[in-house]
């Protein structure tokens, strides 16, 4: 998929009424905490793979310094349940998250462009 410039964090989407984009980054407190965090993130993806919620995209990267970057796109309307945050696995991910990580930098993002193929 390729897309042009968007100057807002929420814009109309063909897949849903509004497309929210959020980027979060945080450092892990230790390599062990990063490993635990990764296992919990993998469980979120396993649940999303089982439940297959529509109108949502989610990408998590573990960087070489054991920090994490989460990028999410949600096509739900304001006031509707976030399909990622409403999973049991995400609740488990959130449990103790403050002890596993440092300060979170979380920002709404504007999509400038995207080219997507199969990611492994």
Predicted regions and their residues:
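Short, surface-exposed ligand-recognition loops at beta-strand->loop->(often short) alpha-helix junctions
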Residues: 27-39
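An amphipathic, aromatic/His-enriched active-site/gating alpha helix that lines ligand/cofactor pockets
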Residues: 43, 47-56, 73-108
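A short local loop/turn or secondary-structure capping micro-motif enriched for an aromatic residue
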Residues: 31, 77-80, 115
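Short beta-strand-to-loop capping motifs
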Residues: 25-30, 72-76
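Onset of an N-terminal alpha helix
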Residues: 17, 38-41
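Glycine-rich beta-strand-turn "strand-cap" elements at beta-sheet edges
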Residues: 1-20, 27-28, 56-67, 90-120
